[in-house]
Amino acid sequence: MNIWTDRKKECAGRNNTVWENVQMKKRISEILNEFRYFWQTKCFAAGIILTTLISYGIILTNPTIGVDDTAFAEYYADGISPAMGRWCVYLLNKIFPMAYNPFVCGAIDLIVFGISITLWCVVFRRMFGEKISVWGYTLFGCVMLSSPIISELVVWYVHNGITMGYGLIALAVLFTLEALREGVTNKIAIPILPALFLLTVALGFYESFMIVYLMAVLMVFLLIRLLDKKEYSKKA
């Protein structure tokens, strides 16, 4: 009798694992489809590319050397960066070793930034849907891309992983939204664990991303309340 019970539990566990894998693939597929939606829209693609060229074209082709750039080897070869708690860029440099090259690093940085901004547009589209046209999302993307607070970092220091961190936080917020959909059940662990992992990696780039994540989650809670979306509302 115990053998049959154990087999049933084992089969149930396998079924749960398969179901979790299917759900995770479905969530990732939805994010990719929404990501493609923006870049298949001409006004969004043209707006982001044009804003990138206008905002960073001169900086990219005429790089400056800051004090942190002169200490590139100390940060990413000798281990000062992980000692500061910023271990992700150090790890990336070990996996993909690259000498100091402002143009190449800056170009990669801007491509990653474009991806990160698109993921934030996906976050807002999950909240607003068609209530905001693609022109509204394009305007948001262009403003974020050309923000002086962020662009200043590109001028002085292109190796800090800030742009990648923004994308990881956006993904963490998306998975947090999925956790809200599940409610307080055993299934909540499926999306919340990836969210925690992504948040941890983002903090490895820059510890201030904790504030970005918390503010984003608070913003999501406020928008859910204001928009009264049925899929996120809890039953009394």
Named regions from a protein language model:
Residues 36-66:
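Transmembrane signal-anchor helices characteristic of membrane glycosylation enzymes that use polyprenol
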Residues 169-191, 224-231:
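Membrane-interface transmembrane helices that cradle and orient dolichyl/undecaprenyl
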Residues 54-72, 80-92:
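Extracytoplasmic catalytic/substrate-binding loops of multi-pass membrane glycan-assembly enzymes
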Residues 212-236:
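Perimembrane helix-loop-helix junctions
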Residues 79-107, 111:
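Short hydrophobic/aromatic helix or loop-helix immediately within or flanking a transmembrane segment
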Residues 82-86, 112, 132-180, 204-209, ...:
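Membrane-interface micro-motifs in multi-pass membrane enzymes
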Residues 3-4, 17-37:
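Short, Lys/Arg-rich, polar N-terminal cytosolic tail immediately upstream
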Residues 190-207, 212:
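Membrane-interface alpha helices of multi-pass inner-membrane proteins
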